[in-house]
Amino acid sequence: MEVSPLQPVNENMQVNKTKKNEEAKKRLSIERIYQKKTQLEHILLRPDTYIGSVESVTQQMWVYDEDIGINYREVTFVPGLYKIFDEILVNAADNKQRDPKMSCIRVTIDPENNLISIWNNGKGIPVVEHKVEKMYVPALIFGQLLTSSNYDDEEKKVTGGRNGYGAKLCNIFSTKFTVETASREYKKMFKQTWMDNMGRAGEMELKPFNGEDYTCITFHPDLSKFKMQSLDKDIVALMVRRAYDIAGSTKDVKVFLNGNKLPVKGFRSYVDLYLKDKVDETGNPLKIIHEQVNHRWEVCLTMSEKGFQQISFVNSIATSKGGRHVDYVADQIVAKLVDVVKKKNKGGVAVKAHQVKNHMWIFVNALIENPTFDSQTKENMTLQVKSFGSTCQLSEKFIKAAIGCGIVESILNWVKFKAQVQLNKKCSAVKHNRIKGIPKLDDANDAGGRNSTECTLILTEGDSAKTLAVSGLGVVGRDKYGVFPLRGKILNVREASHKQIMENAEINNIIKIVGLQYKKNYEDEDSLKTLRYGKIMIMTDQDQDGSHIKGLLINFIHHNWPSLLRHRFLEEFITPIVKVSKNKQEMAFYSLPEFEEWKSSTPNHKKWKVKYYKGLGTSTSKEAKEYFADMKRHRIQFKYSGPEDDAAISLAFSKKQIDDRKEWLTHFMEDRRQRKLLGLPEDYLYGQTTTYLTYNDFINKELILFSNSDNERSIPSMVDGLKPGQRKVLFTCFKRNDKREVKVAQLAGSVAEMSSYHHGEMSLMMTIINLAQNFVGSNNLNLLQPIGQFGTRLHGGKDSASPRYIFTMLSPLARLLFPPKDDHTLKFLYDDNQRVEPEWYIPIIPMVLINGAEGIGTGWSCKIPNFDVREVVNNIRLLMDGEEPLPMLPSYKNFKGTIEELAPNQYVISGEVAILNSTTIEISELPIRTWTQTYKEQVLEPMLNGTEKTPPLITDYREYHTDTTVKFVVKMTEEKLAEAERVGLHKVFKLQTSLTCNSMVLFDHVGCLKKYDTVLDILRDFFELRLKYYGLRKEWLLGMLGAESAKLNNQARFILEKIDGKIIIENKPKKELIKVLIQRGYDSDPVKAWKEAQQKVPDEEENEESDNEKEADKSDSVADSGPTFNYLLDMPLWYLTKEKKDELCKLRNEKEQELETLKRKSPSDLWKEDLAAFIEELEAVEAKEKQDEQIGLPGKGGKAKGKKTQMAEVLPSPCGKRVIPRVTVEMKAEAEKKIKKKIKSENTEGSPQEDGMEVEGLKQRLEKKQKREPGTKTKKQTTLPFKPIKKAKKRNPWSDSESDISSDESNFNVPPREKEPRRAAAKTKFTVDLDSDEDFSDADEKTRDEDFVPSDTSPQKAETSPKHTNKEPKPQKSTPSVSDFDADDAKDNVPPSPSSPVADFPAVTETIKPVSKKNVTVKKTAAKSQSSTSTTGAKKRAAPKGAKKDPDLDSDVSKKPNPPKPKGRRKRKPSTSDDSDSNFEKMISKAVTSKKPKGESDDFHLDLDLAVASRAKSGRTKKPIKYLEESDEDDLF
């Protein structure tokens, strides 16, 4: 077809036209891109900025349905429409805040006519013209944008309206919007209607009005803007729920919906709408906890099973997403619940705060000032808590109810579930033929296969036992037997934490190897087929620890899979304990009682060779094969016999059955004691015919032996205060009787060899080290000497050197405390047929009180503090004299703090602190067992650097300690020091701890556990037993001396008759000779006869006969009954010489005299002799210790000057003002409360230390000094009250604090230790520390002069002119001793007037020098105004020689010490003295009644002549002496 010539022209025209249009569009787009809209247009164009989305959304919401009520379901609604309705509704509710008289809101929702109306009878809107805007106020605020009454932020409002948009937005999104309001105040009614999205305003109607105010908003939502046809069911259900919200959250307002009143009476009944028909896991209705906290806050709480849920309102706005108001309340509840859950879930899965919150459903209704939200939709309140304008502190009642409403149980169930999930991850649900990752497992070849039920897993005690089992598998084969070694004891899963179980490799390995699954029930045979092994065989040593391992494995299976025990799933493999052989005969015994029975029924048992098997490692591979070849004899099955088996297993391992366990063990001990008395053999399990065992029998006959031995190892004996390990050490040292020091490591080897010690040598070395320690807080009397670094108070003994480098030997006091003469009266034990240590030693004083004791066994624990040696000795003397013993306070050697009694068996221990100036304090003593380094790290460092929770308190501290003394100089600001003083420096700096002695449990002399209520009960028990044993000793000595005397008499007569020729022995037959001797009336060897009569194997020590004698005995004793005259016929010829004859006669006469002397003595006399010898040696030892301490101190050895300043820095400052620790009423009340309240776990756990107790003010304390209540006790080193004292506060049964009482009492009949003159100083106190780990300390007491703090009463006089300090007065010849004083005497002493000669007398300390059993008058200083004091005294004793003077440090006798301070309430303190007249007078007046402080020199006696003679001298007062106390640390193992 041809193309018309016009065609191209048209096409070109069209192209040009298109180009022009595109260019026009480009020009227009600039204007379109950058447009300006009015606010009304903007709201309609972008509604989501103002009212939220105008699109339909579907989500889960709380709605109200007619047939169901409030429920949580999926709804489809338009958020924008919901919001405009809500704005009008909240405005109506806000009106209640403006007008409290408002009482009604009427809501009408008419879906058919698309009409919503909200009416309230609150105060109407002012119907008045706005002078600025020139229009009526209702028209202004409903028809003009950006208008509001809420723009004044200075005004605190609790309304929902905030930004001035709400009602206008409703107007804009409505086709018709009518406001009608009436104001009685302005007497007008206003009505106006807007149409077309607020685009067109109708005529305003104004009418006169005289009725009640009201406001009514009626609107027709513009459904087209929300893409809706009508108000559907879902949006109506949501709006109805909001009407209910308003009814619940607005107080005292009735809400009507469509003419019907809503059945809601306040917030609590509103909450019920949500929880109606809701039940917890057990089917019970949910408990609701409600509290009206105040007029602005109302809270309800219940349990939630769907995570954290909250329904909350802020000023009637439903904050569906919560906000800070919800967090504020929820966090308070969570914090309390977390604590409760942690307590109840000890050891379970760790629970965090958000996990606790997930179990809570909280309802909050709050009025908050000027709240802020994160959007105009107001779903999340963002205002900070500090701006709320009110607080919501939930009451204790609410919290208590919250704990009991089911939330805690729900959390704990969730914890168990989570734990189970975690545990199940450790198990395999599928049976595997091969297991990887357990290298030490020798798997049975058939394990995990078809025949797995026939397989047995042998669990052995350690690798060596595995080797034995593997040797035996050569006999039975490897197809059906697997072997896995256990590393020691497995966990007690019944009491273990979830974390422990999860991380315990041993348990996880057993589960993996056997194929066990948690929570699976293995009732039937099919379930057993899912396991890799059908049985577990336990193969442990036949000792008590082996029994414990068996018990723990039984407990493990029983706790998790009790059904397995019914299938005979467990069995044990037993091996012999003893084998006897003769020729080719061999017998094996599987229990010692069975062996003993065999011995008693076999007359010639000594001809058999006996071999003891200590563990599986003793058996050879050959023997292992023999055992496995006779599997029937060695395999013992555990048989389930019923509920009594379950009960027995729980009894042994459940924490809840502590009391039952005590009863169980007590019954066992009583039964064993009765059997011994009746001569019956012990019960045993493994006889020749035993093939099975019930769990009940195993627990009650085998495992109980472990529990009992655990107690024996952990709890010392009342008699000697020692545990078996310590007794073995002492036995070995006595036997070795080393004259030279020996290495600790070597001694440990020796102990293991000589005393048959079967445990690790490391623990033995620690026992030796602990027996030798003598730092403050360890031993008061160390039985071994610490030669080398045995540990110090810096680290609590943990800084001891390696046992390879340190040496020890017996203390010179040891054999005086444990006299060899008593050894014959003791019952020695036998182990492996070897004679080892005795059942107990019998010291001359109760060592359990001197060095304290501590240990935790099964069912019981023991905690006894240290007491002062001299106080104990004095009390023993009182008991011997038939008098009542004096009360004692704990005392630790060389401790300078105080120990005060709070209540019976409860004490408070305080360190020492002094104020140097307004910004500096000095800490010169820490509570007992608060170690210097620990204190620095845990108290001072956090105070210096601050922690996350606490700001720094101090600005700096300096350290001036030595290994024996403490000195921290602490700097802080004036304000903080003043505040700390107000609170109490001891409390702030944690210088007070508490000591409770409520678990004084010890083995008595018959081996039964006994709980003592007081220390004096222990003392009386010991006294009776010891006196009885002195009687036994006398009896034995009389027999022995009689026999020796007869022997010497016979020998002397024989020699004399031979010389006279009356007897001829030359060339005569032996038989004839014996006949002649009998005829002439000679006795058969009297000593030998006497020993045989004792029916004792002669002790190795006493049987030191020469080899010749032994040989002679052998040849002589043809018949046991024949007479023995070797003692005569074996005498050497040179006995016939004159010299030897005379010597023999002299010996005979001396022995006879010795015998006569002994006969005249009573057991008490023997005891007193021992005590006197011991005290004398104690003085010498302490003098030497003091001398050693003084080496290098200024003033010693003539080279003092260079070191003087350097040494002074370690001593307490002389100008410090001592802070007296206070015991507050609260502390006493707390102590009383503890007494009334039985401590639940009295037997297993220690009560916490009470640190930081508040103390009384200094002033009150000083006033009290003069006049104390008679009932209270306080420990002072200078005095010891003698009146009856209140019992002291309980200390935690397991707590360790021990303190050693300062000792020389005025009642003491023991020569006091030497004491040096002191510098004016304040009283120092004894502090007891709470956790000493060991039971012994034998440190000798040392006196220290360097550590006293001057008394706060006269700091300015702390140093007087040094003129006379260096002059050493002659040793005083005599010292009065004070004895038998009543506490009341203290009150009678009136201080002398300042003018009295005594007052001018330079510090002279009266030393009380007691002498046993004698009361002598004390010479008192004749001060003019001094009242008479009771005078009692003792023999005077000369000062020890060689004491050196120390001008600066009052080190010696030569200085005149100040008199002790007056006795106050019973308190253990180091003695101190003041130069000030007043204090001096007080001391003088008190001197007689007060006990002499520990360490006080025997040579300082206040004597009239001396006092007068020296008063002219103004000697410089000495620095106070510090007493370092030691506490025992022995049972770390």
From Swiss-Prot:
Main localisation: cytoplasm
Cofactors demanded by this protein: Mg(2+); Mn(2+); Ca(2+)
Modification type Phosphoserine: residues: 4, 1106, 1213, 1247, 1295, 1297, 1299, 1302, 1332, 1337, 1351, 1354, 1374, 1377, 1393, 1395, 1451, 1471, 1473, 1476, 1478, 1497, 1527
Biased composition (Basic and acidic residues): 1256-1272, 1360-1371, 1443-1455, 1493-1504
Active-site residue numbers: 805 (o-(5'-phospho-dna)-tyrosine intermediate)
Region (Interaction with PLSCR1): 1435-1441
A biological-process GO annotation: apoptotic chromosome condensation
Domain Topo IIA-type catalytic residue range list: 715-1171
Site annotation Transition state stabilizer: residues: 804
Modification Phosphothreonine occurs at: 282, 1205, 1244, 1327, 1343, 1472
Annotated compartments: Cytoplasm; Nucleus, Nucleoplasm; Nucleus; Nucleus, Nucleolus
Binding-site positions, Mg(2+) 1: 461, 541
Covalent link (Glycyl lysine isopeptide (Lys-Gly) (interchain with G-Cter in SUMO2)) residue numbers: 17, 156-157, 261, 352, 386, 397, 416, 418, 425, 440, 466, 480, 529, 584, 599, 614, 622, 625, 632, 639, 655, 662, 676, 1075, 1114, 1196, 1204, 1228, 1240, 1259, 1276, 1283, 1286, 1363, 1367, 1373, 1387, 1424, 1444, 1456, 1461, 1486, 1494
Annotated stretches, region: Disordered: 1-22, 1090-1121, 1183-1215, 1231-1533
Cystine bridges: none
Highest taxon in the source lineage: Eukaryota
Pfam families xrefs: DNA_gyraseB, DNA_topoisoIV, DTHCT, HATPase_c, Toprim, TOPRIM_C
EC number: 5.6.2.2
Location of N-acetylmethionine modifications: 1
Subunit structure: Homodimer. Interacts with COPS5. Interacts with RECQL5; this stimulates DNA decatenation. Interacts with SETMAR; stimulates the topoisomerase activity. Interacts with DHX9; this interaction occurs in a E2 enzyme UBE2I- and RNA-dependent manner, negatively regulates DHX9-mediated double-stranded DNA and RNA duplex helicase activity and stimulates TOP2A-mediated supercoiled DNA relaxation activity. Interacts with HNRNPU (via C-terminus); this interaction protects the topoisomerase TOP2A from degradation and positively regulates the relaxation of supercoiled DNA in a RNA-dependent manner.
Reported function: Key decatenating enzyme that alters DNA topology by binding to two double-stranded DNA molecules, generating a double-stranded break in one of the strands, passing the intact strand through the broken strand, and religating the broken strand. May play a role in regulating the period length of BMAL1 transcriptional oscillation.
Stated name of the protein: DNA topoisomerase 2-alpha
Protein's organism: Sus scrofa
Gene (UniProt): TOP2A
